Amino acid sequence: MMMARKQDVRIPTYNISVVGLSGTEKEKGQCGIGKSCLCNRFVRPSADEFHLDHTSVLSTSDFGGRVVNNDHFLYWGEVSRSLEDCVECKMHIVEQTEFIDDQTFQPHRSTALQPYIKRAAATKLASAEKLMYFCTDQLGLEQDFEQKQMPDGKLLVDGFLLGIDVSRGMNRNFDDQLKFVSNLYNQLAKTKKPIVVVLTKCDEGVERYIRDAHTFALSKKNLQVVETSARSNVNVDLAFSTLVQLIDKSRGKTKIIPYFEALKQQSQQIATAKDKYEWLVSRIVKNHNENWPSVSRKMQASPEYQDYVYLEGTQKAKKLFLQHIHRLKHEHIERRRKLYLAALPLAFEALIPNLDEVDHLSCIKAKKLLETKPEFLKWFVVLEETPWDATSHIDNMENERIPFDLMDTVPAEQLYETHLEKLRNERKRAEMRRAFKENLETSPFITPGKPWEEARSFIMNEDFYQWLEESVYMDIYGKHQKQIIDRAKEEFQELLLEYSELFYELELDAKPSKEKMGVIQDVLGEEQRFKALQKLQAERDALILKHIHFVYHPTKETCPSCPACVDAKIEHLISSRFIRPSDRNQKNSLSDLNIDRINLVILGKDGLARELANEIRALCTNDDKYVIDGKMYELSLRPIEGNVRLPVNSFQTPTFQPHGCLCLYNSKESLSYVVESIEKSRESTLGRRDNHLVHLPLTLILVNKRGDTSGETLHSLIQQGQQIASKLQCVFLDPASAGIGYGRNINEKQISQVLKGLLDSKRNLNLVSSTASIKDLADVDLRIVMCLMCGDPFSADDVLSPVLQSQTCKSSHCGSSNSVLLELPIGLHKKRIELSVLSYHSSFSIRKSRLVHGYIVFYSAKRKASLAMLRAFLCEVQDIIPIQLVALTDGAIDVLDNDLSREQLTEGEEIAQEIDGRFTSIPCSQPQHKLELFHPFFKDVVEKKNIIEATHMYDNVAEACSTTEEVFNSPRAGSPLCNSNLQDSEEDVEPPSYHLFREDATLPSLSKDHSKFSMELEGNDGLSFIMSNFESKLNNKVPPPVKPKPPVHFDITKDLSYLDQGHREGQRKSMSSSPWMPQDGFDPSDYAEPMDAVVKPRNEEENIYSVPHDSTQGKIITIRNINKAQSNGSGNGSDSEMDTSSLERGRKVSAVSKPVLYRTRCTRLGRFASYRTSFSVGSDDELGPIRKKEEDQASQGYKGDNAVIPYETDEDPRRRNILRSLRRNTKKPKPKPRPSITKATWESNYFGVPLTTVVTPEKPIPIFIERCIEYIEATGLSTEGIYRVSGNKSEMESLQRQFDQDHNLDLAEKDFTVNTVAGAMKSFFSELPDPLVPYSMQIDLVEAHKINDREQKLHALKEVLKKFPKENHEVFKYVISHLNKVSHNNKVNLMTSENLSICFWPTLMRPDFSSMDALTATRSYQTIIELFIQQCPFFFYNRPISEPPGAAPGSPSAMAPTVPFLTSTPATSQPSPPQSPPPTPQSPMQPLLSSQLQAEHTL
């Protein structure tokens, strides 16, 4: 307590009196000098507590109140302040003034009657209970303010503040004021109290007044002056603290700050506080709808708010808040305005998009037009009050419609004008686009595939550039190119179909030979549709290869009209017509052909089958489902490793019918097991109804777990596997050929390819395997096939509706999805007819593999391809089968007006006349035709039924007698099928009362084939014996002697006399006049006694075959050959054959002659038949001089039309092909990839071995290659066509043999030709186990080649080149450098880098041609090799990139040199030297030649 009091005592207290001019208005003017404001600011400095108005005119009552208390001074209260030395002090402030009575306007009378000057100088003030003064409003309302009394009612004044007003006061003279102040000062000075002069209102001060005041102060001793402004709160505290310093001498002297410097500090403080307050407001207030009371309450506790209110007051704070609110509202309105203006163009586009409607309307008229639009209210809103920004619509955020009064603003009018301009520009751009497109369509220079860079100069002009960007024209050009390319492709595909006869005559397979492709070039080369794709050779190549694939492998999926293939349409029509209750029961039967299930046999001993089955199952889903091309298939595997004669190891069980078989081997013993098992399986089903195992698709796979692709044992296994695959006519896959791995490295892609092949086989079986045999004729009397062309301009419904709507139409009993049964009255009896409706491409495969009594062939009269396919089909149909041609037209008027329709109708009718067929035309526009239209044709079929069945029976007897028939039907008998297993639809060929064949017959083998095959197997006696025995059995499956029931003999000329009525009543002849020779030209020297059962000569007539005429009575009709023709040297020259021929020479010519094909009877069929004599059956792999010689010898003596098909008058074609293939296969097979050369008399230890065995680090180049290249560069660089012209095969073989014996062989001394040396060098690379460019690198090379930028492409290729194995890289560098040198002499040798790449890329790369992708990628391979040759210095010698010859930098030809497909001239032409022969035409299919073709040049 004592301490507190001591501390209180220590706080000094000062009583300060503020004096200055006072009095009436006469003395002081209209306002005072600011004493009250100065006191107010010092005592209560907060802006809200500061009052500017303090009146001195009071009423008597106010004067007498406790605040004034009848005194002429005011007590302002007590103030605590901390001075500069941090010492706190208290100050009591008193203001000496003079109050004026509001009645008399004279000073109020008070207790002290002295004048103001004396009263103001008083140092003792007393006024009992006098209250502290706040403001004028306090007077009379003292209770509403704080009531604080003057302490003790008295004060002793310690100092005076003498105020001088330096502003320009109203009605006041400053000099008079100064006189008053001077007198007052003199009076104050008498008190000896400190005095400080305070200049008030300096914010409005007059410079002269301030200067005079300072002059006055200077005239007085130690009189200090402080410049202040109470309103601006400048130096107010400084005035009082200065006086306190004078009062208390112990305190330091206060520094007096000039007014303007102090004002600057105060302004900075206020500005800082304002910025902080504005930041606070912007942070708190986000919505323009906020109000001040709520916001001020939120800010009450914020220092920023408190500081600003203290300095500037609440009103200014509120004013700033309102300004912020106004700004937020303005920003909000502007945002809404921008949104509305942004939506306005969209509204214009939606409501007035038509330029014609608004082109000449002003904005005002357009506004009226907008109101009439149906969707006006969707875009605009009409407000009751305007303008829109002054209404509550601005806060309606859900309504985004545009206020309609916005249209009256200038921005809206500008947007409307912009909209008009946009519409006008769009119209112009559309006109430019149309004009550009018309230019494209009419310009003769725009052809499919022409690059934009070449076309631009022909079609662009300045107007086009003015209105549209070039990218737009490029886009239009690209779309136009796509259209014309698609159209050109469609037209080219139609062209290929129009030449269907050519493709079927050439008998193309998966690897067509270059000679056959040359024929395609010759025939199609002049067609405009062929030339149209000149710049798209890769696409044209792909279309040709795709069409070849279709011809070779016709399915619904490969059909050019897919998915609108006729077969699919027919299946849908028939399935929708008939609901078969038996379908449910058929799901579990053996005849189920559901392609969603794959049954696969895996054959291999010693655990091979089981291991592969486990690997395949690992690739399946949990429920044994396998995904192929995105579709799920159920996969059922049956691994077999034991004796297949045992039921447990049988290929087929009551619940498992195989669709294919994978045969595995890894040794000679396991290969022998495969051969024995296949033989046993085929023998067990040979004479049975379900003999489809004979044609089960097989795939032979060499298992090599180590992944070793070298070594003599592996090569021997590969070679033997290829020989066995050739014998069995199955696919062979080995680890080096297609990336096949086994064990952990099984190739899922290859497994998928195998399964796809099985699916294709099943689909083909769906079309042809459901027919019954002759034995089933009790159920079906006739089998008719109706052929339709896919893609014809008529609906299959029009053709089938009369059939399906007939009441006699029933579902086929065999469950075929393409067949129906008809019961029609033909003659005196009703006949059951099985009508199969198929596409032409499906019908090709059944012409000789299925019993068909007649064909109804449809074609469109206005489509060339339709009639072309019909001609191709009829070429291979026997002339005893009746044909009904049906032409579909658009009506009689169309026929008269359309030359094509008229020509095709005429041609169809002429074909029918020449083949003695029937012809009719049906307008598609007329009501549907009736079945009665075909009644005459059905009568012809009935008349020829017996001879057709007898002929088919004989053909199948010959077929059953030789199980070595190729699993893939011969193209001559039908369309060739890739990996298909079309079964013979006939199940039994014998009468039901006995078996024609005996399964345990033992027949001798062919010794010559045996010996040859033994040599091939390299001394493997066990396998040699098995294969020789197997081969002999395959070739000698003739029926043993049988004892049939006594046949009922009859004279065929009597029973079949109707066949010889061609000269009566216009009946058509159905048999050719050429002699009928047995199709199986059996050689008694090759066969044992059972031969007599079939072809033993008879005394008067020879039984050719027997037909079950009436199965219920067991009668056998024996058809005899009354006039057997001479063999004309075409047989084997045996005595028995010559004797038989001698017996027949003098016999009378029979009216019955052997059936021939329609091609021999009709001049309009087989127009490309001449090409058949030029080529052998099969691909280039099967071509060779020995086979050619054999075919030439076999065809000698045949003249005329039959010369093109000698087998038809000699022997059964299937047996002949088998024997010929066996002889051919005794030669060296053509594996892929090709292993080393294996010849019967010479085994090389240099050629055909891995590259690493013939090079060393010291000599990285094989010495043979080095010798060859040195010889060629020394003598052959000027040789025309070097590397393109093949050398003599025997000389190349001799060269290799001699070098193999002596590595120091001197080529110059031996006098070998340059072409021989060049061919031997190419042969060296062809015979390498792996190509010089490794397969693993070829993929990277192709990816690098796809880069468009030329320089980047070359650098990418160079990086791939660095990854080559060292040996391969060195040899490749050596060879490419040599070829580069050869190309530099192209003016002489005519071998440019392009020509050299065409010759060398198959040798160096040897790609796999088993897929369409590989075939179509050949252009990339050739171009890659060409780039290596061209840029040899860059790739191998770090030289800069050079420009290719004949191409400007950056030109398309420089970027990607092209190789023409089916063109006779290279893409890059080189000038020929004067008087030199023209360049040798490049082989059209050279880009498609595989490594085997290269080997063929060397053998």
From Swiss-Prot:
Domain Rho-GAP, residue spans: 1249-1436
Sites bearing Phosphoserine, chain numbering: 589, 770, 773, 970, 975, 985, 1072, 1134, 1142, 1150, 1176, 1179, 1221, 1236, 1472, 1476, 1483
Top-rank taxon, per record: Eukaryota
Modified residues (Phosphotyrosine): Y308, Y1087, Y1105
Primary location: cytoplasm
Annotated region (Disordered), positions in chain: 1124-1148, 1177-1207, 1446-1499
InterPro entries in the record: FF_domain, FF_domain_sf, P-loop_NTPase, pG1, Rho-GAP_domain, Rho_GTPase_activation_prot, RhoGAP-FF1, RhoGAP_dom
PANTHER family membership: RHO GTPASE-ACTIVATING PROTEIN 190 (PTHR46005), RHO GTPASE-ACTIVATING PROTEIN 35 (PTHR46005:SF1)
Domain notes: N-terminal part (1-266) has GTPase activity. Required for proper cellular localization. Mutation of this region is a severely defective loss of function. Mutants have defective morphogenesis of neural retinal tissue, agenesis of the corpus callosum due to defectuous midline fusion of the cerebral hemispheres. Mutants show defects in axon guidance and fasciculation.
Annotated protein name in UniProt: Rho GTPase-activating protein 35
The species this protein was found in: Mus musculus (Mouse)
